[in-house]
């Protein structure tokens, strides 16, 4: 709808706009999880359902994921927080609800804790304890030599592991969030347990 979106590094952020109410300035941004992208079936289905209900939606891939510019090995939570800022810049003046899944949930918490442009926040199975996640899921994988969940398209980088460890947890950001926030999390989630 608004043409190309680029992040701070000049990398293109691939995105698809789903028109809901053409007269509305309300917009739901949909952020994916680690190893995901904007074209994951449930992200597409959610965007289509929102548009059918009259709600404008934008699904996008963080840099290094899907058809966005950049390298997957450069993708970190901190970089994705900045990417989300670039998307918010492109949609200045809109009333934004951000829905983030898994790692995208952690991105939303960190961005919403510092950016009042996010007016509503939804975390779907949001990553909370990032350092624990890194060790639990990838602690036996050598960065630069191994892959996330044995997926060759998703090489594990030292930058990713260092970023998760440095963040530690997003719990410290939670008290800074001053907008309505919905947490949706299944108690049987084995990738991001409660």
Outline where the language-model segments fall.
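Conserved alpha/beta-hydrolase "acid-adjacent" motif
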Residues: 190-194
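Gly/Ala-rich beta-loop-alpha elbow adjacent to hydrolase catalytic centers
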Residues: 100-104, 108
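The serine-hydrolase catalytic nucleophile loop
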Residues: 35-47
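Short beta-strand/loop motif that positions the catalytic acidic residue
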Residues: 176-178, 183-185, 189
